[in-house]
């Protein structure tokens, strides 16, 4: 039984439509190279809430909350070829998407 190579790509952004769009674009590129692909798998959305005082001196009870959510997607590529890796390296992702690649 041969050992299978795996590449895991995690996409993270504050805009869910941007993550979905680029996940589909990565999948289209990988499908052209005949590699096996799983995904995009939606990972749990993390919500961050920050509470700040409205006034710098008085009114401790008067506060304002700011929140944002970070959306994540996971794409797994099984048995990638050198052509697959070359095509992934040529992709130019926007600045709003954070990419983490593990093999």
UniProtKB/Swiss-Prot annotation:
The keyword Thylakoid does not apply. GO terms for cellular component: ribonucleoprotein complex; ribosome. GO terms for biological process: translation. Keywords: Ribonucleoprotein, Ribosomal protein. InterPro entries: Ribosomal_uS10, Ribosomal_uS10_CS, Ribosomal_uS10_dom, Ribosomal_uS10_dom_sf. SUPFAM superfamilies: Ribosomal protein S10. The keyword Ribonucleoprotein applies. Gene3D superfamilies: Ribosomal protein S10 domain. GO terms for molecular function: structural constituent of ribosome; tRNA binding. PROSITE patterns: RIBOSOMAL_S10 (PS00361). Belongs to the universal ribosomal protein uS10 family. Part of the 30S ribosomal subunit. Involved in the binding of tRNA to the ribosomes. This is Small ribosomal subunit protein uS10. It comes from Chlorobium luteolum (strain DSM 273 / BCRC 81028 / 2530).
């Amino acid at each position: 039984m041969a050992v299978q190579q795996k590449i895991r790509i995690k996409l993270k952004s504050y805009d869910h439509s941007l993550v979905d769009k680029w996940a589909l674009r990565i999948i289209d590129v990988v499908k052209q190279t005949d590699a096996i692909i799983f995904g995009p798998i939606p990972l749990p959305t993390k919500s961050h809430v920050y509470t700040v005082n409205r006034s710098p001196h008085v009114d401790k009870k008067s506060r304002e909350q700011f929140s944002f959510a970070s959306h994540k997607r996971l794409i797994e590529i099984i048995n990638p070829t050198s052509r697959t890796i070359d095509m992934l390296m040529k992709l130019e992702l926007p600045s709003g998407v954070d990419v983490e690649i593990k093999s």
